[in-house]
């Protein structure tokens, strides 16, 4: 997730590095790049086909008189496969403050009318963790999505403790695993055991080449939502580390 960063020249340089990397092994690993919307089309055209691309946001419904918004069908039209929805910055930045309901509406439209995969972000603020509300907050955010959709086959959940995003603070592998395990249990109890088993749950929050291996070894962590570290060629070290962890588990 490149967020609101990078110039056209920066992206060209980064894409060149990604294109020079060994094959992704897409049968076992997916790598999804989410550039700023203005660069989504050109990034999709420039990247190798074994990289997927994603928008960072989309509107709640079909396009129309919604200045500045992005119809999920437009994302699909330029060849992108995914959209990130509910990122903590969309939920909590004062000028945005997207509600659980709004995010769920966006997800439902993207899934049902644009056939995009949705990376649905959940996570707690520091004060919510300190008051013991982590699981309750995540379950509330999951319930909003469950109320809006019935087919979870194209949903990936990303748990991102807000206090760890861009701060250099990382949830310990044990802290992250505890939440991931609770998310999977919630899915089993409130959606279905099949959805719980098949849904990938990513961890996001200051993921780096230095800490990704210990996180990836946790049984319920199925990958990462990477921010700052994805804007450097060394992002490929995270990909390689995750692939190596998968190979060790076989």
Curated annotation (Swiss-Prot):
It comes from Gracilaria gracilis (Red alga). The keyword Cytoplasm applies. In plants, there are two types of TPIS, cytosolic and plastid. GO terms for biological process: gluconeogenesis; glyceraldehyde-3-phosphate biosynthetic process; glycerol catabolic process; glycolytic process. One of its GO terms (cellular component) is cytosol. It comes from the Eukaryota. It catalyses: D-glyceraldehyde 3-phosphate = dihydroxyacetone phosphate. The lineage of its organism: Eukaryota, Rhodophyta, Florideophyceae, Rhodymeniophycidae, Gracilariales. Belongs to the triosephosphate isomerase family. It is found in: Cytoplasm. InterPro entries: Aldolase_TIM, TIM_sf, TrioseP_Isoase_bac/euk, Triosephosphate_isomerase, Triosephosphate_isomerase_AS. The active site is at residues 87, 160. The keyword Cytoplasm applies. It is an enzyme of class 5 (isomerase). Pathway: Carbohydrate biosynthesis; gluconeogenesis; Carbohydrate degradation; glycolysis; D-glyceraldehyde 3-phosphate from glycerone phosphate: step 1/1. GO terms for molecular function: triose-phosphate isomerase activity. This is Triosephosphate isomerase, cytosolic. Signal peptide: none annotated.
